[in-house]
Amino acid sequence: MTPTGAGLKATIFCILTWVSLTAGDRVYIHPFHLLYHNKSTCAQLENPSVETLPESTFEPVPIQAKTSPVNEKTLHDQLVLAAEKLEDEDRKRAAQVAMIANFVGFRMYKMLNEAGSGASGAILSPPALFGTLVSFYLGSLDPTASQLQTLLDVPVKEGDCTSRLDGHKVLAALRAVQGLLVTQGGSSSQTPLLQSIMVGLFTAPGFRLKHSFVQSLALFTPALFPRSLDLSTDPVLATEKINRFIKAVTGWKMNLPLEGVSTDSTLLFNTYVHFQGTMRGFSQLPGVHEFWVDNSISVSVPMISGTGNFQHWSDAQNNFSVTCVPLGERATLLLIQPHCTSDLDRVEALIFRNDLLTWIENPPPRAIRLTLPQLEIRGSYNLQDLLAEDKLPTLLGAEANLSNIGDTNPRVGEVLNSILLELKAGEEEQPTTSVQQPGSPEALDVTLSSPFLFAIYEQDSGTLHFLGRVNNPQSVV
């Protein structure tokens, strides 16, 4: 169980190169040429050969209409099939998108904490957040389109179409990023990683979505659910209907907000992410065990444990340690533990920033007996709150030009990102005592029984799929 290092080193080199050219928190110099409109596309956009006809629109069916549930096995198989067909340029484009998504994810993770959402823990999916922003970019016109591209840390030159992001290329690359995560190869008996993304477009009655916009979102995920319902008469009831719909369609035990929607909204854009991974070689320990929330408070939680060869190192200067646990051939779980619980905020600020991967060392794997809580993390946040914290409260507000979304400019209410992340022990039985091979070094005991940070990383594209902190395994984030 050893995560490979070549792809990681290449990614670190790319990020070091990029970071060295960074001005402040924003980046304006990397070409990202594979993500821009090319000259021929720009010629068609600027000089259409035929007269532009009014775009076709449709009114979403009512939310109570009968709907088939999401089939996660089908979604997984579609991702695997698409990933197996990726060509070299597709992989390069995926790596470019991953790099930008990581950087935007770090900034928004910081906003998530500053908005006060990190008190009980935190979780954020950079690709899902990035996909949400790019979806709005596709639905926007200037000046909003340029403002969104600037938020995405990609330079735009006024009047230069070839400096504009091609949103279709970006969404397709984000789907490739998902495919590279779940396509792990290996033996057929290996439990696959599952990641499903669903988008709900909830509209007020009478609001008509453009077919072209919805079809573009299918590049990101085929699990699209445009639905209409009354958002103004009883906002609390509207929220309850949306939550019931999501539970019925997905079966996921999400942390869905109970607050009422804004009465003047005509569009809610909600993204739901479900990740499920199996930690091979781990088993659940009997009973429950103490997890210290702070120096004086503990809770009793289920724990899992396993012994294997993992990369592990300790940073004595900054007082934290890192353990890398493979989740597949190319996916790795990074577990970051401060040596002192009170240092969690400081270590988080030090680690979860643009140069995260430069902190990752590459020591030889060693025998580790790792024990940690069984993780089932639910989190939800409103992107509008993060934009407000980032001093962009009106970016998706009433003045935003989002007329490529529907027949009229929508009034965007909540923009939710909801996440359910499950990491469970493998099914194989483990011996009650560790079998020590003659002459082999004794396994180092590493126990995460106090707050820690985590990230899930896929090495081929260099994507950080999840960033998070666990303050209390029993709390909903």
Swiss-Prot record:
Essential component of the renin-angiotensin system (RAS), a potent regulator of blood pressure, body fluid and electrolyte homeostasis. The gene is Agt. Pfam families: Serpin. One of its GO terms (molecular function) is type 2 angiotensin receptor binding. Keywords: Disulfide bond, Glycoprotein, Secreted, Signal, Vasoactive, Vasoconstrictor. PANTHER family: ANGIOTENSINOGEN, SERINE PROTEASE INHIBITOR, SERPIN. Glycans are attached at N38, N319, N401. Its main location: secreted. It is found in: Secreted. This is Angiotensinogen. It comes from the Eukaryota. Residues 1-24 form the signal peptide. One of its GO terms (cellular component) is extracellular space. GO terms for biological process: adenylate cyclase-activating G protein-coupled receptor signaling pathway; aldosterone secretion; angiotensin-activated signaling pathway; angiotensin-mediated vasoconstriction involved in regulation of systemic arterial blood pressure; angiotensin-mediated vasodilation involved in regulation of systemic arterial blood pressure; astrocyte activation; blood vessel development; brain renin-angiotensin system. The keyword Disulfide bond applies. Disulfide bonds join C42-C161.
